[in-house]
Amino acid sequence: KGGAGGGGGEEEQGSSQNRIFFNALLSSLDVSMNDDYSAFFALYTIYAIFENKGDADELLTAARLPHASKRPQADPCTRLEAEKDCDPRLLEALRLLVGAAGRANCRLRTITLQLACLVLRQFVLALDANDVHDQIRALAESTKKCLTGRLSEAAFVHHKDLFIDMFDEEYVEFESFRLRLDVVGHELLLPPSSSPMSGLPLNKRIPSGREETTRATLASYLHVRKLERDMADACDDELPVRVGDNPLVAVDDCINLANSDLLSCTVIVSPSNERQSRFLVADQLQLILVEPAGKAGWGAVRFAGLLQDTSISGEPSDSRVLHIVVEGPPRPSGVSWRVGAARRTPLLQAKLIFDDHIRCMAGKQRLTKGRAGARELKHSALCSVLRLRPPGDGVRGGGSSSHFDRLHRVNPFRVVTGCAPGSVRKQNSPSVLDGREEDAPPEDPVVKRH
């Protein structure tokens, strides 16, 4: 420490020289020149201190880390001042680390960014200071803006066809992954790898190639977006992305097909080879297989899947046959994404046999066109939520006005939810009052003409 005749600057300099561990911690948090190997363990140490349930008030006070005291003090003012004392250099180092996620050349892994966001939340809860709260919120907004600019190029130029699938998969990983200090993994003890052949999860290594870089940017965007919403004390009601406000058709619903184009076909489901007689229907978003109900013009839904997740192919040896695969929503992989990993389980693998090749061609054209339209709608809705716009476009938004007009999806069917199997729907009113059978679908609404 400085001598008796020295000023406050000498005392501060002497104190800084004696805090060897703290200075090493600050140096480790710098990711401007190197990778985040040291930064991860520095954040890991700080987060472990916050999560420690023991009595470490004196240690935290000496380290100038904000904390909630676990012991009563005689002087509440002194206790409050000690709890909320925070070295500004540490807070600035954390802010610079999170801000580095917006740079294109930064070697910051997703797991390190997630840990930094957790530590910043702990600081905000302990400090309870409006200025710190506003600084972190502004930091999250500026970082999210930088990430949005990088995602715009991927969404409209490099990966337009795959951007929907990549976002859905990374969003599932973001929602399911929970960081646990006791099972971090031995792979983090080694320097960060950038090779997909290492077998490491993408969030624990540096991305390689354009596709992995886009996925890592999406994951970083989701973490920074959550930090921003937490600082604003707001819920994220825009994710997951929805197209339109109307609910989707579900299995066992009863729908009015009076104004729909139906294609009769025989469905052979793989791998059981079960044969079913169905009618093929498609709206803006869904592929639907129905069977006739008890009333003319109505059908009971036996399968419903998203057109955006449907693949269609013909059979060279038979012009009446279509092969379809409808994939389910992405599932958490447990080891995150890597090349060749199966992220989706098919909901339906089937062969559709039509009466003739003309109906088969009509069905293929309808499904192919419907899939392209459904993916375009989902792409426009996703870009609207993420505030993405084409590179060089000064208009805010992710697509043309015609695309946004189509987001207000109108369900072409009159849907009765919850029909029992066999295309019947129980009515609340007695059948003797209206002369209808109790198990029949409801009557169509009567349009009054004046």
Place the predicted regions along the sequence by residue:
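Long all-alpha helical scaffold domains
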Residues: 1-17
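Helix-boundary capping/turn motifs
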Residues: 14-21, 84-91, 257-258, 277-283
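Polar helix-capping/helix-linker motif
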Residues: 18, 52-55, 87, 343, ...
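Surface-exposed beta-strand-to-loop junctions
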Residues: 18-22, 67, 88-93, 326-332
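Short linear interaction motifs
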Residues: 21-26, 90-97, 259-271
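Alpha-solenoid helical-repeat scaffold
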Residues: 25-72, 76-253
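Eukaryotic phosphoinositide-binding membrane-targeting regions
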Residues: 196-278, 283-450
